[in-house]
Amino acid sequence: MNITSTYVFPIPYVHLETLKAEVQRLCDLGVLKRVNRSEWAAPTFIIPKKDGSVRFISDFRELNKRIKRKPYPIPKIQNLLMQLEGFQYASSLDLNMGYYHIELSPDAKKLCTIVLPFGKFEYQRLPMGLCNSPDIF
């Protein structure tokens, strides 16, 4: 796979420390790992949240163009709800950061590298934004 994009999106200074803290948190959780070299890195930008934190979004479009899609049939909500007829109890789960529970293969880790103004980081866990992430999850 020949991909060479390493464009760095500018990050507003007001959000830089918050972004660094979020990246450090994800490194501490084993989701990201700092790398010194990478032939490819997806540009990453941020979206400020209402609570003052930031969500960073990696632009995996170039990588997605080259990935062979492995679709998994995701059931429709209506069909799932119809199957609940007659049930007395139901549970609700918050799958916040759910993708991050799935470890990537060594080859996939090399492809899932992101670039920020302060360095490159390799995803160790399944990132959001890859075309196969919902199907794998």
Please place each PLM-identified region on the residue numbering.
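Metal-dependent nuclease catalytic cores in nucleic-acid-processing enzymes
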Residues: 79-88
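Active-site beta-loop-alpha junctions of metal-dependent nucleic acid enzymes
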Residues: 65, 72-76, 129-137
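Acidic, Ser/Thr-rich intrinsically disordered and amphipathic helical segments
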Residues: 18-21, 79, 136
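Reverse-transcriptase-like RNA-dependent polymerase core
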Residues: 1-4, 47-55, 84, 93-124, ...
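Reverse-transcribing Pol proteins
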Residues: 1-72, 119-120
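Conserved hydrophobic/aromatic pocket- or pore-lining residues that grip, position, or stack substrates
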Residues: 26, 44, 59, 80, ...
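Conserved pre-catalytic core of RNA-dependent polymerases
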Residues: 34-36, 88, 92-96
